[in-house]
Amino acid sequence: MAYKGWNSDSFSMNSELFNEILLYAHLDSSGIDSDDLNTNPNTLENEINSVEKTLNIEELKKITTALNIDNRCNICSIINICLRHETDKMWIYDYALLCYKCNAAPRTPLAVVIIATEFMQLIQKHFLNINFDGLFLNNILSILDFHVHFFINRCFSNTNDDLLHNENITLYHMAILKSLLLEDESIPNIRIKKFKLKGKPTKKQHGNAILEKQTLPLNTHFTHLIFYMWAGTNIFDRISLTDLAIKKRQILKAIYSTKNELNCSAGPILLSQIPISITKNATSSVCLLCELMTSSQKNFDLLQFIYTSVINYCQNNLKMIDRIQFVLANLLDLARIYTNVKTTSDCSKIVLANEQEFSNSDFVIDCHSFLILKQVGPVGLYKHFFCDPLCIANIKTIKPHILFYTTESCILQDFKVAICYQNEYLNSVEKHVWLAIHFFKAFQVSKLNHKNKTLISDFLKDFTQLLADQNFEIVDPTFTIHYYV
């Protein structure tokens, strides 16, 4: 079957490749918290846990080698091997389409796992004579390699004039991730103003008519994978998914690996742009609404309908949270899915069946989207639409007409060739803006010591101005940075 990109037909909860990627997106369990160790350090149990914590830090250091600026990109190395062994151009054309889709995708855990799985499927499909087994098992690849290649450094994109400017952005971006994973007490001190002054917006140089031919909708439905990925974690703390969490744990444990006991309570957190599992004031570090809009056209349209309805709800000066509550109540009352979906018990069977659906000329809502709206509630919608710069950057980035569509079969190959030779992957959000946003998110999940408090104060002055310059319509980040995650 011809590769079309972002096609859920090639994904399932039982897929060995998909589950292997999920497995290696989990961190190992770290025993007890370091604060507990300090309370009573002399017990045998705490000594054992201290050793385990040391071993886990060593494992993290191994994983985070992908975040060293002077370390090779392992994805690029694999691509180089493939280019030397290909007998035709079919592989590179498929890879170009994958990059084209990636460029139109938001930065979400679901997007990362789709990109990683499709990349692995492509190299296995095109190079039967090369053994790609054990890439994760033998530490040749890690999940962070996909972050670096496709999202942080964007190795596939065409270069700008200032190579060292780009190098420094990548360096600082990786330093933030590394400090979070290694639980450093302080975040790297980054002056975003110098990047703001040097950053140059990319402009489209030329067009190609065939790139406008994506007119056929793909049968894309990834929503069930969201529930599978995050079942049994605090991301779904209002929705019980016990059976699904047990099924996932059994499947992952059956995969041969050298990993220790998985931290299942955090889930596949290495897929997240901010790999820290935390909840705060009815929000979580993984935004389920960003995941939802990544999953299908109908879910993207549903969120667009909710946003438009909130903005246009009435002419009175209602607060946004009140508008959201009224719109959400009206929508759920109209759909009435809640009459058949009881969220007081385990919802695993409901997720797997997904039998209830309501649609009209404005939106479609099914059991999956209903449960996610139930989980996030009005506060989650408020944070997603109006407060979180990462969510708003994702909304600006996603291009559903690229992500969820394909061309007619007769021109699909020409379409891939056009992408490859045009080699133009334009940013909706510039790299220095992504860096600043991830700096912001790092402050949200880090411990507030004296040094970090000083950094936050200086950072917010520049960050607020940067968002204004980039036309981010957003609630004052000074509120969000301390109140949500």
Swiss-Prot record:
Q: Does the keyword Cell inner membrane apply?
A: no
Q: Where's it found, cell-wise?
A: Host cytoplasm; Host nucleus
Q: Which domain of life is it from?
A: Viruses
- Region named Zinc finger 2: 287-391
Provide the primary localization.
host cell
Q: Which UniProt keywords apply?
A: Host cytoplasm, Host nucleus, Metal-binding, Zinc, Zinc-finger
> What single Pfam family name could you report for this chain, choosing any that match?
Herpes_env
GO molecular function annotation: zinc ion binding
Which residue intervals make up region (Zinc finger 1)?
A: 73-155
Q: Which residues bind Zn(2+) 1?
A: 73, 76, 149, 155
Q: Which amino acid positions bind Zn(2+) 2, per UniProt?
A: 287, 290, 384, 391
| GO cellular-component term (any) | host cell cytoplasm
Family of this protein: Belongs to the herpesviridae UL32 protein family.
Describe its function: Plays a role in efficient localization of neo-synthesized capsids to nuclear replication compartments, thereby controlling cleavage and packaging of virus genomic DNA.
Name of the protein described by the UniProt record: Packaging protein UL32
Say which species the protein is native to. Human herpesvirus 7 (strain JI)
